[in-house]
Amino acid sequence: MAQLETRTEPMVVNFGPHHPSMHGVLRLVVTLDGENVIDCEPVIGYLHRGMEKIAENRTNVMYVPYVSRMDYAAGMFYEAIVVNAPERLANISVPKRASYIRVLMLELNRIANHLLWLGPFLADVGAQTPFFYIFREREMIYDLWEAATGQRLINNNFFRIGGVACDLPYGWLEKCIDFCDWFAPKIDEYEKLITNNPIFKKRIEGLGTIERDQAINWSLSGPMLRASGVSWDLRKVDNYECYDDFDWKIASEKEGDCYARYRVRVEEMRQSLKIIRQACEMIPGGPTENLEAKRMATDDKKSDIFGIDYQYVAKKVAPTFKIPNGELYTRLESGKGEIGVFIQGNNEVTPWRFKIRAADLNNLQILPHILKGAKIADIMAILGSIDVIMGSVDR
């Protein structure tokens, strides 16, 4: 008796675009053979707002409030890179105290970014409970931002050419250390719940594997690169701001799968806590209360401490600051990877060219490659492990 052969026709399915609060307005045109993915075409651009052209028609002071809306989970990083580019082009130095304040804000943002990634990622693979624990700690970071900048999630508008908008408020460093003391055991709690959970490990181990050479050839960065065995972090490589003052290590894994990317991000939160603690202890001038006491002791309203006016921790750059002739590319390590800005000035208040390199756009490009051969149920787990924010991808 002849054996019947079952043949299936490929089926094209549209995933998304989803609501921005989920995985963003990303559309995946997926070709399926049964439950197996045989092709995937990402469709982007739904959230394109012309951020580069806006930058070319605004002064730097006017443009800084815009940029946190690109990656609305990590706005501080874009504020930093947008002011770093003209600073380097014009050779503007940053006071040491301002540099320490920047590092504090960036590392808090790195933790907030990873927490915002971790909660939805766990929900994607079926673990709902940790989602609520993670958002509890994230709110504490936003409380610190609100005290320092007046805003919580986006539109902090805190970074300035030459420094930051203002000094830290009274008691802020103490509250920041309190947060570190609170959050460190919470990471251990997450790991007890998640890391060695047999259901979680079986769900994502070996899923979406990226080899070391593939990660390099696809220009991946951040946890996507370090999870594939490449120990590359711009905080160590470029030593921007004052990261060379601190003792910390690069988090990396070798397996290159979704589980390795999870392990890298959890370890990065631990390392960020180490940096924050050291910055709080080593910040020039100490807490703001100490600076005020020194000013009152000297009876000098414009006390020059560490070469800066303590009331405004920045070199005061005029709103009509002209970007000098020249061009350069500057970069930094965000929670998602390398973000950079290519700026070209022509001695005008607005740049002639302003090109933004988003980490998640480069990381997203490998998605069709690692989805081929996967099951339809694994699509959201693999996409979630990449950590994309479509405002940053589309710009």
Curated annotation (Swiss-Prot):
Query: Mind telling me which GO cellular component terms the entry cites?
Result: plasma membrane-derived thylakoid membrane
Q: Which reaction does it catalyse?
A: a plastoquinone + NADH + (n+1) H(+)(in) = a plastoquinol + NAD(+) + n H(+)(out); a plastoquinone + NADPH + (n+1) H(+)(in) = a plastoquinol + NADP(+) + n H(+)(out)
The EC designation for this entry is: 7.1.1.-
Its predominant location is membrane
Identify its membrane topology class. Peripheral membrane protein
- Single Gene Ontology BP term? photosynthesis, light reaction
Pfam families in UniProt: Complex1_49kDa
Q: Please give the Gene Ontology molecular function terms for this protein.
A: NAD binding; oxidoreductase activity, acting on NAD(P)H, quinone or similar compound as acceptor; quinone binding
Which SUPFAM superfamilies does the UniProt entry name for this protein?
Answer: HydB/Nqo4-like
Key words, A-Z:
Membrane, NAD, NADP, Plastoquinone, Quinone, Thylakoid, Translocase, Transport
Q: Where in the cell is it found?
A: Cellular thylakoid membrane
User: Which InterPro entries does the protein's record reference?
Assistant: NADH_Q_OxRdtase_suD (IPR001135), NADH_UbQ_OxRdtase_49kDa_CS (IPR014029), NDH1_su_D/H (IPR022885), NiFe-Hase_large (IPR029014)
Q: What does this protein do?
A: NDH-1 shuttles electrons from an unknown electron donor, via FMN and iron-sulfur (Fe-S) centers, to quinones in the respiratory and/or the photosynthetic chain. The immediate electron acceptor for the enzyme in this species is believed to be plastoquinone. Couples the redox reaction to proton translocation, and thus conserves the redox energy in a proton gradient. Cyanobacterial NDH-1 also plays a role in inorganic carbon-concentration.
What HAMAP family would the database entry show?
Answer: NDH1_NuoD
How does the annotation summarize its subunit structure? NDH-1 can be composed of about 15 different subunits; different subcomplexes with different compositions have been identified which probably have different functions.
Q: According to its UniProt record, which protein family does this protein belong to? A: Belongs to the complex I 49 kDa subunit family.
NCBIfam families tied to this protein? PRK06075.1, PRK07415.1
Q: What is this protein called?
A: NAD(P)H-quinone oxidoreductase subunit H
Q: Which organism is it from?
A: Prochlorococcus marinus (strain MIT 9515)
In the UniProt record, the gene name given for this protein reads ndhH
